[in-house]
Every structure is written in C-alpha cells, then in structure tokens.
C-alpha cells in the first residue's frame, strides 16, 4: 500500500533543512545522510547526497529523473559476486 497523497512525500526534516540552506547560499556541497527512506523532491535536484548503504556513504548526484524515488534505491546494500560457471558447479576442473 502506498503513502496517502494528503500526507505528502516523506523527507527527513534535517535533510530538507540542509538542502534549503544550500539552495539559499548557492553552495554545492556533499551532504551525508542515513535516511534511505527519504523521497527525492525537486528541491534536491543538482545536489550530491552521500547515502549510507550499511558500510559506507555512496555519493548520489540527484537529477530530474530521480524525483519521486527513494534515496535508498540508488545506494545498493548488497554486492553481487556473479554466477558460478557450470563446470565449477559439477566439480570439474576447467582446462
């Protein structure tokens, strides 16, 4: 079930406060955040936000196409090691 439209999108209050301060001053600075659940709003476009993935902060440059998505969608929490070869599964030695 999606969020009620009368509530509006969720954005961490501290994060939106930092974005508004940077918009007023015109500064382009990387903002660290742990709020992966925050929705990207049009005010954030053009800023770089470092989103925590559980291990480190991943810098994400916000574009217009990202508006409406969550910050956590752009900072992956798992590493994909790749699929194993069929020969490795059977225990054969590849020559």
From Swiss-Prot:
Kindly give the SUPFAM superfamilies that the UniProt entry links to this protein: Ribosomal protein S19
Coiled-coil regions listed: none
A GO CC term attached to the entry: small ribosomal subunit
* Entry superkingdom: Bacteria
Family annotation (InterPro entries): Ribosomal_uS19, Ribosomal_uS19_bac-type, Ribosomal_uS19_CS, Ribosomal_uS19_SF
Give the Gene Ontology MF terms in alphabetical order.
rRNA binding; structural constituent of ribosome
**What keyword terms does UniProt attach to this protein?**
Ribonucleoprotein, Ribosomal protein, RNA-binding, rRNA-binding
Q: Which GO terms describe its biological process?
A: ribosomal small subunit assembly; translation
Among the Pfam families in the record, one is Ribosomal_S19
What's the family? Belongs to the universal ribosomal protein uS19 family.
What is its biological role? Protein S19 forms a complex with S13 that binds strongly to the 16S ribosomal RNA.
Q: Matching NCBIfam families, A to Z?
A: rpsS_bact
Q: What is this protein called?
A: Small ribosomal subunit protein uS19
Its source organism is: Fervidobacterium nodosum (strain ATCC 35602 / DSM 5306 / Rt17-B1)
- Gene behind this chain? rpsS
